[in-house]
Amino acid sequence: MVLFLNREINCELQDTVLVDTGLYEGSRECVRHLSKNGCRNFIYLDKLGKPCDRDIHLKGFLDQVKDLGIVFAPEQKISGCENIKELEEKLRSLLEKNSSIDAVVARYDELAAVALSVARKMGKKVPDDLSVIGFDNDFISNYVSPALTTVEIQKEEVAKSAMEALLSLIRHDGVDKKISFTARLVIRESTGKKCYCKQ
């Protein structure tokens, strides 16, 4: 069996290869990047639907925030939304209540695009008033305005390695118990002109 690590696994699994796509470290890199730009007050946009407290993207975010000594209140994590409209309303409400929020970290790029839309409707300038960062480097990240800073996972390499590992397991060949990849930060306009590099 081949498992992709998107949540914490606390047990030893037989005949299983774990694939670390870089989700955890990529999330930490998001926070480090925003912190270098002076951001200290974050909102975290979790995926739609039922939240998972063992999600390693969230764990990476929380671990890095803690390591940097940044205070992150539980109410600044928006999760459990059933649809985009609900998420949009919660984000707007939180931004209205707390004018010191200067960054939004989204679980994936579509949610980051929602944050850009909310900021625009509220008259906030991105990145001057609010930095926004996504995850996945989806096609939408290049077509929103401003262009979205995001994190790219090596999807083709991950898929190829997972398939090779699965075939090795089927053939009972020797195979590593864990395969790790590094995610890449793609810096665009949504997180500050001073660190902007074209991708």
Task: Place the predicted regions along the sequence by residue.
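Hydrophobic beta-strand scaffold residues
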Residues: 1-3, 72, 126
